[in-house]
């Protein structure tokens, strides 16, 4: 889900959004012993704008199917990756804590939506002994609106892991 060699590694969607990217490339590449380092068969544009991570993954899945058809029909020759390699590290559940200091509303919105998919620890903020988990965010009329699930801090930490 990155324009390799930029973005090799883990949590590509989250690492792209947290760095301010608004679009990326879906890349079909040959598997090698080194992660995401193989030659590239094709790349296709994928918007990261709006919507939750889940919605972006659905769009990426549909685009992947189109790419598979093209790979089978066109049999492109793979091309060696060129350019500076940038590695992404898989995000940890602790990195899902919303760092609200010095964040714009758009950054808060992006942070919540980039984690809003099954299997990902939701964006959260701990206040006192309460853990607030955010999902289904929207940026409207100068504010971020989101669903919030409130639990006692530490009681449901493995719910989305």
Task: Show where each model-derived region lies.
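Donor/substrate-binding cores of folate-linked one-carbon enzymes
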Residues: 1-87, 94-97
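Short low-complexity stretches enriched in small and charged residues
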Residues: 88-92, 103-105
